[in-house]
Amino acid sequence: AGSAHWWMKDTPFKDWYHVFDTYTGSNIAFSTNMDPNASKKDLYIQESGWFDKSMVDMNLDNPYVLNYFKQWAIWWIEWSGLDGFRVDTYPYNEKDPMAEWCAAVMNEYPNFNIVGEVWTASIPQLAYWQGGNANKDGFDSHLKSVMDFPLHDALRAGLNEDWGGWGQGMVRVYDILSHDFVYHDLSNMMIFPGNH
């Protein structure tokens, strides 16, 4: 949500979005979501910090905000006949409410697709966010698809360099594909040539 949007002038609750004394951006450390050693402060700033000074961070821990997002999603799907959502910066949100949101949408529309932009080169961290994955902490995002950034990065590098030995050129792509065993559902990995 943009800070200049009309609804930000008169929110239903003071905690409709995350409020700080001064601007606090996300630390963009979404590995704190799955790291058993992460500090609570780092996780809080990751989830609650704003993406940008003009882009407030909605407080999905507020049950009214979460319910609003569920109703909003269902309305858009019904009104426009959408087949899916792309959720940018997916791991920047509170993970449990987002999992509840995904589950609610998928329960209402089992053939719908939600793809999360999980911008990481780490294959295990990417796999963590795909729904149905056997995560050690028991977390299930209910997120059907994730964007395959490791493969995207390997394709870009592999197509733009000569093979000079193992780990270079198209061998980069092979190396990434050899890790496919960590994903719950390969058919729902979104392969893409570019982002934005």
Feature-to-residue mapping (PLM):
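Active-site-proximal helices and loops of the catalytic beta/alpha 8
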Residues: 72-83, 89-192
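Glycine-rich, aromatic-lined ligand/substrate-binding cores of catalytic
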Residues: 195
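Short beta-strand segments at enzyme active-site cores
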Residues: 1, 86-87
